[in-house]
Amino acid sequence: AVLPPEQPTFYQALRDSGYRVGIVGKTDLHKRDTYCGVKGDMPSMYHYGFTDPVETEGKMNSAWYGTNPDGSIYPMGPYQKYLMDKDPELMRTLEKDYRSYMRQKPRYYAQPSVLPDEVFLDTFIGEKSLEWLNEHDNTGAPWHLTVSFAGPHNPWDPPKEDYDAVGDTLWPDPIPNDMEGKPAWIRRRAAQQTGGMTQADLQQVKRCYAGSVRVIDRWIGKLLDWLETSGHKDDTIVIFCADHGELLGDHGLLEKSCMYEGCLRIPLLVHLPGMTQRRDSDALAELMDLAPTCLELAGADWNRREMDAVSLVPVLNGSTEPLRPVQRSELHNCTMLFDGRYKWIRSYNDTDELYDLETDPQELHNVINEHPEVLNRMRPYSFRH
């Protein structure tokens, strides 16, 4: 996907309100080609509103370098340049490893990284994030930094020390791949992704996924330590979230790009200065709500009428009033609607699904033909943006 250049962003609003706006890591805002330049796609980053971007490649693009006519190689992104400055053989080793992953049938990858921890991609992102904070700490301007780790996206290849630290933990069995009531495209994808995989294979996937999370957890700890030692713990808002989950074998699926809970139900944690008590909320939030939330908390100028999102500030202040009647998500040719109990997955060229998450949290029983009143109530929200 490409964020249209004419689309206003909340990063621009923060910039125009006097903030230094940074990002370190994978942006995923533009995918025109695999070559973003050894400093990242700076024109696009500036246009989107970042004043001080440190863009990196994602997991797979980090391995595809360029080759000169004489056979020598050159970097196509910032992380590749970092590896090649260290040792060109690091780049060749990573590329060879990932190409073997692409040839696997079924195509899944779960083993420790061939790179040492000190040059692992998420280690690079963590180190660059600390550099960014130290560089902008004394500028006199407020700052907003997005740290976008590449993991735990597949390939699941944590540093060996994190893989070993996870150990032979016995992970819960995946949700059964009972395909009754599931659309044909889900059945096809399940056969492609996990057909032929054993329970031992799935345990290995989860071990590597957990190791990938462990890397990120370690670096988040270092970033929080920086806030403590720099004296910014009490004047910094911290938000932790993910963009999606992974199925890791649930319903016979491994990755993302579906509307089941393993993909959609992601963590969202917010800490405000002065907050001393944990508070949980089951409000129907969406990722886009972080935009008005950040703007309101930052005191930036913004127009509520220009956003479909809603600010989470009332929830953070203890409000229990609903944010919205229905939560909505879209993907390719399907739309998901969720009212806090019922989830309706509208597949426009396939079987619709309705799950009662109160009685069926594993989404095993499609009750699409049993609750016409639920569909009638949610239908108007299908076409709202």
Predicted ranges, named:
Residues 1-347, 352, 361-380:
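Formylglycine-dependent sulfatase
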Residues 358:
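Residues forming the ATP-binding cleft of Hanks-type serine/threonine protein kinase domains
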